[in-house]
């Protein structure tokens, strides 16, 4: 058999599809990398929508960027990508076959809502009488049995919680069915088993935050103002239970003195049997302490009790020094008792300082910096995928193959093989996608689809009709800028025929609405006043193209970085500057003309400069992908 026939034979047996289990930031990144590389991707998520833990965060370290601002474009891209099939409310039951030709056995749970009919109007949730604890807000408030996880979730389709639905449990109610204008409720929906053929599997199920309720001396669950770090993220978030206002749970008063306690659920064999460092807790505590001051009305005291500050990442030490310069107090101590403050509010903390003095100090709130543990379903997932776990129930991987599981053709990324922060998780996700793509190089493009290029409308001779979309960005912009006043001002500008203000302009529902408005209003210029074009411009341009508009008829005003952030304590100046930025963007939009991009032939040959371990690994993986590669070493 010739080598050409051998390749053909291999291609016939290799499936050009990959299953990614887990819809957090790592799973999303792996799915996008593979889908953009010519593979069909099944993105499997056990909850009703993708986003994972990152969607719950207010900000990300070390830059303190808005977490949703970074995540939302990726959510929308995942949802609209023609080579990614989202499979929500679905779990992996087993994997049979061998690398290159697996059969994944999936268990899909009922949503009780037909996603092809649901218009996400929210009437089902509004009319639903059943309230349950809201897991997305860490149990700090309530949601309905008919719900979406959060406002920017993808797919933006409601689901009915069968474990709490009155009709499913007791045979009464059906209010959601009665009021649904689209007839999307389907109580006949059943659990089903689905088999899909894939060539490789990537496991990105995320992690579980350590539950400190078993450590009674912290008072968690008994003292209202002792909260976990994830609960505190939801307190700070503009989409959280307190709408971004700094408040303690006991009486919703603004705390003036907050303590963070490090290494809860980490670095302790005796207390929790987790001897490892969770690697993210030091930095997220610093981030929370610094960001709390921005949410406070003033006079906030922040104290971080620690054993060691492990600020090991890029610019992490700078963030640590910056926090100290801003007045965050760092105490090397391990508090050993917590009791409720006067009238059950606040927390009295007893500790011994570095000089050996015993101190009792009253705080308005205590935040437990909980560590990262393996997902609760790690054992079941490992058995289904046929891989091994380590003693902490993380996926067992080699130090020299950190994304390769013990079974050939199965890869892991994110925090499933051990605690990681977001940048590390994204790097691991791309590495896992690269490895999977290398395995399936013979079948690249076999199952993927290319979008049809739609001709843009010719608006070159039409008078400008500008649409201006003003983003609140949660509280990132609206917490400082009077967005209603800016929106009203934009409507008075020459050429503007439509204005709108949205909570998150980058969310899927607003993107769909934007495309609809472009068609209905005949808009031929678009201005978005939001955050940075570096991350969001491509998203809005894709929406314009989908609506039949040339993507270069777009202008963006960065009223977050250039107004609300730099004038955080000067709302009047921030609002006036936002008006100026919008006026400038509209003036420029009036002068925009459609542009076309030339098509260039691609030379599919790679050059790697540097023959160290990184360069050699990159060259080997590129060649495994089927690309001729030159490696240069001086």
Description of each model-found segment:
Residues 1-634:
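Residues forming the flavin
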């Amino acid at each position: 058999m010739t080598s050409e026939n051998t390749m053909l034979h291999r291609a016939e047996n290799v499936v050009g599809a990959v299953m990614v289990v887990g819809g957090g930031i790592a799973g999303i990144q792996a799915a996008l990398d593979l889908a953009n590389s010519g593979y069909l991707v099944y993105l499997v998520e056990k909850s009703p929508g993708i986003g994972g833990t990152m969607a719950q965060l207010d900000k990300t370290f070390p830059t303190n960027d808005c977490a949703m601002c970074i995540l939302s474009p990726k959510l929308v891209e995942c949802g609209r990508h023609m080579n990614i099939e989202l499979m929500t409310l679905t779990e992996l039951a087993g994997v049979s076959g061998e690398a290159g030709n697996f059969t994944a056995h999936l268990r899909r749970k009922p949503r009780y809502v037909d996603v092809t009919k649901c218009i996400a109007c929210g009437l089902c949730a509004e009319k639903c009488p059943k309230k349950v604890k809201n897991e997305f807000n860490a149990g700090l408030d309530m949601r309905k049995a008919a719900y979406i996880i959060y406002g920017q979730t993808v797919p933006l389709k409601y689901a009915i919680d069968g474990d709490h639905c009155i009709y499913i449990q007791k045979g009464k109610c059906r209010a959601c069915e009665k009021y649904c204008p689209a007839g999307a409720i389907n109580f006949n929906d059943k659990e089903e088993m689905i088999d899909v053929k894939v060539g490789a599997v990537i496991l990105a199920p995320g992690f579980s935050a350590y539950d400190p309720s078993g450590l009674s001396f912290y008072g968690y669950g008994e003292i209202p103002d002792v909260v976990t770090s994830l609960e505190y993220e939801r307190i700070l978030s503009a989409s959280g239970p307190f709408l971004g206002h700094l408040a303690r749970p006991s009486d919703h008063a603004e705390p003036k003195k907050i303590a963070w306690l490090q290494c809860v659920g980490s670095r302790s064999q005796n207390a929790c049997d987790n001897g490892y460092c969770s690697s993210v807790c030091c930095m997220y505590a610093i981030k929370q302490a610094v960001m709390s001051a921005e949410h406070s009305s003033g006079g906030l005291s922040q104290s971080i009790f620690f054993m060691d500050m492990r600020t090991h990442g890029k610019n992490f030490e700078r963030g640590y020094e910056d926090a100290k310069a801003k007045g965050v107090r760092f105490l090397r101590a391990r508090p050993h008792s917590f009791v409720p403050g006067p009238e059950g509010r606040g927390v009295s903390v007893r500790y011994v300082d570095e000089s050996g003095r015993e101190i009792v100090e009253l705080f308005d709130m205590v935040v437990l910096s909980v560590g990262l543990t393996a997902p609760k379903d790690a054992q079941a997932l490992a058995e289904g995928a046929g891989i091994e776990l380590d003693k902490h129930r993380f996926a067992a991987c080699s130090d020299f193959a950190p994304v390769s599981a013990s079974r050939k053709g199965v890869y892991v990324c994110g925090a499933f093989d051990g605690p990681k922060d977001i940048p590390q998780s994204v790097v691991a996700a791309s590495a896992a996608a690269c490895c999977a793509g290398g395995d399936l190089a013979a079948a690249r493009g076999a199952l993927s689809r290319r979008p049809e290029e739609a001709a843009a409308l010719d608006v070159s001779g039409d008078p400008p009709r500008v649409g201006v979309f003003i983003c609140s960005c949660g509280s990132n912009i609206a917490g400082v800028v009077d967005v209603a006043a800016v929106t009203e001002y934009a409507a008075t500008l020459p050429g503007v025929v439509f204005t709108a203000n949205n909570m998150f302009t980058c969310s899927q529902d607003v993107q769909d609405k934007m495309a609809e408005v472009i068609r209905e209003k005949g808009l031929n210029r678009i201005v978005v006043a939001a955050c940075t074009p570096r991350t969001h411009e491509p998203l809005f341009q894709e929406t314009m193209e989908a609506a039949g508009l040339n993507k270069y008829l777009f202008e963006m005003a960065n009223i977050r970085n250039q107004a609300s952030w730099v004038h955080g304590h000067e709302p009047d100046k921030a609002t006036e500057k936002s008006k100026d930025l919008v006026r400038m963007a509209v003036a420029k939009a009036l002068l925009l003309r459609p542009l076309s991009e030339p098509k260039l032939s691609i030379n599919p040959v790679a050059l790697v400069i540097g023959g160290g371990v990184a360069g050699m690994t990159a060259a080997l993986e590129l060649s495994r992908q089927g690309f001729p590669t030159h490696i240069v070493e001086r």
